[in-house]
UniProtKB/Swiss-Prot annotation:
Tissue expression summary: Expressed by the venom duct.
GO CC terms, sorted: extracellular region
Signal sequence, renumbered to the chain: 1-22
Protein name per the record: Conotoxin Cal6.26
Length: 64
């Protein structure tokens, strides 16, 4: 029983770590630095928004 609980916890921890690492790697690969709601007015719109796009050259908005 203890071994089963330990294995379940280990799988959950590894899954969470993988998701966090995957998100960080995605941001690094895209070289993005703006989050939704951040102003992208002075940016040329080439991937600066980490999620979504630069809407009307004003703010980053998340994809729907």
């Amino acid at each position: 029983m203890k071994l089963t609980c330990v294995m379940i916890v280990a799988v959950l921890v590894l899954t969470v770590c993988k998701v966090v690492t995957s998100d960080q790697l995605k941001k690094l690969r895209r070289e993005c630095y703006l989050e939704p709601g951040d102003s992208c007015f002075h940016d040329d719109g080439r991937g600066a928004c980490c999620e979504g796009t630069c809407l009307f050259g004003i703010n980053c908005v998340a994809s729907w």
